[in-house]
C-alpha cells in the first residue's frame, strides 16, 4: 500500500497457435511499484514443439523477478538435458538461477532500467566505491517466487517455488490445483521444522487494522535479524540461506521446486497461472468457475475475461499478474511415441467429479513421484507432488523487458542474447475466501494436522457476499466506490449501513464472529 489511488491500467498481450491460445494481463493495483514479472512464449525453439509460461512475484524489489523473466527460459534451453530429459533440466535451472544471483552482481545489468540508470547506481552505492567493497553475497532481502508451465507435444510440466499458483480447469469447470503454496503455515510439518531448525522463528500472528477489521498474517524472521518473509521457498533472499553449518536443502529458505507433469487430454479446458495478488482475494474454484461461465457465453473474448480476472486482485492491495492458457478442442488427441524428452516425467493430476468435500480421488493418468491428491472444502481438487523440478522465463529485447508497456512476442525463438517481458509484485500471503485464521497454534482439521494456524469456515456469514444486502462479492467489485477501497466488502457494507438501521448491529456481530480477521485485505 503506497498509493492514494490504485494504478488500474493493465498490460495485456495475447497470441495463439494451432494448439493453444493465451492471454497475459498484469496490473500494479495498490502496490507502491510493480514487482511482478512474467514470460510467455508459444514457440520456445525451432526443434521442438515447446511453449513456456512463467509468473514471477517479486518481493523486496523488482530486480530478481525481472531477472527470472529475462533469463529463466534461456537457462532452460541451454541446459544439456533440455531435449532429452526436460524434468531434470527444469530442476537444475531453478537451482542454477539461485546460484547465478549469489555468485556476482552481473545479473543486475539485465534489469537496470535504461531510462533510470543514474538513480539505480546512486541507490546501489556506486558513488561510494573508493572504499574497499565487501564480498558480494547476493540479494539479501530481495527475492521472487516462480510458477512456470512448459508444454511440449501433448504433455505439460508445472514447476514452482513460493506462493504463485497454477490451476487447471477440467471439463465442466472442475478446478484442480497444480501447485501448492510454499508457506510454513500451510505446507507439511517438515517444511516448518526445516525453517525452525535453520534458526527461523515465527512472529505468530501479526495484525494490521483495516477499516475496523483486522488482517492476520504469519511471517518468518531470522533469529537475529528484523527481516521477514511469508514463504518458505524462493529464488534469492540469501539472508535466509546463509547458515554455514547447514546444507543447501536444509536452509531456512530453499529453492527446491515442486514438479508435476502429465498428459494434456481433451477434457482439459484451460490453465490459470497467477501471482499471489489474485489468490489473496479469491480461491481456485471461484476463479475457474468464473472463467468457465464467461467462456460459455457466445462471443466471449479471452482477453476481456483475463482482464476481468486481474481486477479481482485489486482488493488484495498487491500487484496482480494472470496468464490464461486455453487448450483448443481436439488439439491434444495425438500421442507421441517418445514423451517429447520429458525423461522420467512423473505425475498424477487428480480427476474428481462431484466428490464430497474432503474426499480424495486419483486418476489413472500418468504416474506421480511422492504425490497425493485430495479435494479441498472449496471444491477444488489438489494434487501434491514431491520435490523434483524447476523452470524458466520468456524472451524479448532488453528494452521491452523493463518497459511495462512492452510486448512479449509469443512466437519468439530463444536467442542466448535475448530476454523476456516482465512486470513485478510483493507476494504477501493472505487467507483465501471463506477462511479465518484464528491462531498459529491450533490444527486446521484432519487434513491439516500439524499446521499451526487454524482455518475455519464462517458458519453464519458468507464471506463471498454482503451480509446486509446479500450482494455477491464479484458484483461488489464492479462498484467503483467499493472496488477502490482496501476492503471492498466492508466498504459496501458501510454503504448499506446508512440504508438499514439494523446494519450496525449486524456489522458488530460480524466483527465479533470474525474476531481479528479480514481475509479481503
Swiss-Prot record:
Alphabetical keyword list: Hydrolase, Magnesium, Manganese, Metal-binding, Protein phosphatase
CDD domains xrefs: PP2Cc
EC number: 3.1.3.16
Reaction equation(s) it catalyzes: O-phospho-L-seryl-[protein] + H2O = L-seryl-[protein] + phosphate; O-phospho-L-threonyl-[protein] + H2O = L-threonyl-[protein] + phosphate
Keyword ATP-binding: no
UniProt-annotated binding residues for Mn(2+) 1: 57-58
Start and end residues of each stretch annotated as Disordered: 354-431
Cofactor stoichiometry and binding remark: Binds 2 magnesium or manganese ions per subunit.
Gene3D superfamilies registered for this protein in UniProt: PPM-type phosphatase domain
SMART domains attached to this UniProt entry: PP2Cc (SM00332)
Any one GO molecular function term: protein serine/threonine phosphatase activity
Record-annotated PPM-type phosphatase domain positions: 21-327
Biological processes, Gene Ontology terms: signal transduction
Pfam families in alphabetical order: PP2C
Cofactor: Mg(2+); Mn(2+)
Residues reported to bind Mn(2+) 2: 57, 276, 318
PROSITE patterns: PPM_1, PPM_2
Protein family per UniProt: Belongs to the PP2C family.
PANTHER family the record matches: PROTEIN PHOSPHATASE 2C (PTHR13832), PROTEIN PHOSPHATASE 2C 22-RELATED (PTHR13832:SF285)
Protein name as annotated: Probable protein phosphatase 2C 16
Phylogenetic classification of the source organism: Eukaryota, Viridiplantae, Streptophyta, Embryophyta, Tracheophyta
Amino acid at each position: 500500500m503506497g498509493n492514494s489511488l490504485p494504478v488500474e491500467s493493465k498490460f495485456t498481450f495475447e497470441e495463439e497457435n494451432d494448439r493453444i491460445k493465451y492471454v497475459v494481463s498484469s496490473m500494479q493495483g495498490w502496490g507502491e511499484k510493480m514487482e511482478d514479472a512474467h514470460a510467455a512464449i508459444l514457440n520456445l525453439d525451432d526443434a521442438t514443439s515447446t511453449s513456456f509460461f512463467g509468473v514471477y512475484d517479486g518481493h523486496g524489489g523488482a530486480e530478481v523477478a525481472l531477472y527470472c523473466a529475462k533469463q529463466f527460459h534461456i537457462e532452460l534451453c541451454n541446459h544439456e538435458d533440455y531435449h532429452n530429459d526436460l524434468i531434470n533440466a527444469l530442476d537444475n535451472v531453478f537451482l542454477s538461477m539461485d546460484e547465478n544471483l549469489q555468485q556476482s552482481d552481473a545479473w543486475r545489468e539485465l534489469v537496470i532500467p535504461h531510462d533510470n540508470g543514474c538513480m539505480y547506481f546512486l541507490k546501489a552505492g556506486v558513488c561510494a566505491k573508493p572504499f574497499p567493497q565487501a564480498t558480494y553475497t547476493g540479494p539479501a532481502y530481495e527475492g521472487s517466487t516462480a510458477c512456470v508451465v512448459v508444454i511440449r507435444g501433448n504433455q505439460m510440466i508445472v514447476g514452482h517455488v513460493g506462493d504463485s499458483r497454477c490451476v487447471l480447469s477440467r471439463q465442466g469447470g472442475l478446478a484442480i490445483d497444480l501447485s501448492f503454496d510454499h508457506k510454513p503455515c500451510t505446507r507439511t510439518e517438515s517444511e516448518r521444522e526445516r525453517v525452525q531448525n535453520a534458526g527461523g522463528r515465527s512472529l505468530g500472528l501479526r495484525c494490521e487494522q483495516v477499516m475496523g477489521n483486522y488482517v492476520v498474517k504469519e511471517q518468518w524472521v531470522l533469529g537475529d535479524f528484523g527481516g521477514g518473509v511469508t514463504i518458505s521457498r524462493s529464488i534469492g533472499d540469501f539472508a535466509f540461506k546463509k547458515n554455514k553449518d547447514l546444507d543447501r536443502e536444509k536452509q531456512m529458505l530453499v529453492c527446491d521446486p515442486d514438479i508435476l507433469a502429465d498428459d494434456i487430454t481433451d477434457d482439459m479446458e484451460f490453465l490459470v497461472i497467477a501471482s499471489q495478488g489474485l489468490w489473496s482475494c479469491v480461491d481456485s474454484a471461484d476463479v475457474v468457475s468464473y472463467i468457465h461461465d464467461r467462456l460459455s457465453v457466445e462471443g466471449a473474448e479471452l482477453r476481456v475475461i483475463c482482464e476481468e480476472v486481474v481486477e479481482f486482485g485489486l482488493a488484495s492491495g498487491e500487484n496482480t499478474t494472470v496468464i490464461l492458457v486455453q487448450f483448443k478442442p481436439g488439439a491434444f488427441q495425438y500421442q507421441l511415441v517418445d514423451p517429447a524428452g520429458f525423461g522420467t516425467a512423473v505425475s498424477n493430476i487428480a480427476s474428481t467429479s462431484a466428490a464430497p468435500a474432503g474426499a480424495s480421488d486419483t486418476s489413472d493418468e500418468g504416474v506421480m513421484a511422492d504425490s497425493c491428491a485430495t479435494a479441498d472444502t472449496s471444491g477444488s481438487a489438489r494434487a501434491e507432488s514431491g520435490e523434483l523440478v524447476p523452470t524458466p522465463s520468456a524472451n524479448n529485447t532488453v528494452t521491452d523487458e523493463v518497459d511495462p508497456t512492452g510486448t512479449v512476442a509469443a512466437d519468439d525463438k530463444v536467442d542466448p542474447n535475448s530476454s523476456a517481458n516482465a512486470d513485478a509484485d510483493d507476494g504477501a500471503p493472505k487467507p483465501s475466501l471463506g477462511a479465518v485464521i484464528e491462531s498459529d497454534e491450533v490444527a486446521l482439521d484432519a487434513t491439516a494436522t500439524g499446521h499451526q494456524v487454524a482455518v475455519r469456515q464462517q458458519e453464519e456469514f458468507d464471506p463471498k457476499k454482503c451480509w446486509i444486502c446479500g450482494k455477491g462479492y464479484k458484483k461488489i467489485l464492479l462498484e467503483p466506490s467499493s472496488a477502490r477501497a482496501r476492503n471492498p466488502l466492508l466498504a459496501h457494507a458501510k454503504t448499506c449501513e446508512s440504508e438499514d438501521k439494523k446494519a450496525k448491529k449486524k456489522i458488530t456481530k460480524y466483527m465479533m464472529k470474525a474476531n481479528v480477521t479480514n481475509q479481503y485485505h
